[in-house]
Amino acid sequence: MDAGVWYRSLPRFTRYWLTATVVLSMLCRFDVIPLHWLHLDRSAVFSKLQLWRCMTSLFVFPISSNTAFHFLINCFFIVQYSSKLEKDQYSRSPADYLYLLIVSAVLANIGGMIFNVYFLMDTLVLAITYIWCQLNKDVTVSFWFGTRFKAMYLPWVLAAFEFIFHFSLASLVGIFVGHVYYFFKFQYSQDLGGTPLLETPQFLKRLVPDVSGGFGGFGLPPESRAPPRQATESPWGRGMTLGRN
């Protein structure tokens, strides 16, 4: 497939996310923008009101010869799991997916400030991966060396590899972020009968109207969204510890 055709075929917010990540990271890689201006820094945010760091830390990644593969794998996960969420569960409700990203970004910033995670790409990527895996628990995924297991275990496997080999909490923070969203959006209301707590604000619905027609999975209980599918590849590899400059 032609690269331009493939790029335009990506769902809207996945495409925006991938573009912002690649462009901002490459600008820092070639020293067009100093990296230390963009990473999450609690004291700079609160003492100097450098509020842009809360946004840029979600997209910028410190690319080097040691971390390039890590960066590419994260981009793959954006394309793989963000696309699936946006096209399947949120196909008719793009504003709901935008709100998911906003809530996840806010929680990622809070977790990053608490645990001193300076670059939040891993955190946000794993949060979205976790949500997809919870909504598709029985899908079989393939990991390294041909190992296969249900999707619900994938985030924990990734976080374990990250922590064991790089002593990073970024992925665990991502799981926490994803679980908070999943619990309050789906489990609390559908399984426990609680009042929905993460309803998309109306101004976002007006900004990004729902799509009429078609068949979207959003709004169905997680266990009834889709039957088990064939294995999907997940060639995850880690090359750095988030929080390091």
Curated annotation (Swiss-Prot):
Membrane topology: Multi-pass membrane protein
Name of the protein in question: Derlin-1
Major subcellular location class: endoplasmic reticulum
Cytoplasmic side stretches: 1-17, 80-99, 178-245
Gene Ontology terms, MF aspect: signal recognition particle binding
Subcellular localization(s) per the UniProt record: Endoplasmic reticulum membrane
Gene source species: Drosophila melanogaster
Keyword Endoplasmic reticulum included in the entry's annotation: yes
Pfam families: DER1 (PF04511)
Family as reported in the entry's similarity comment: Belongs to the derlin family.
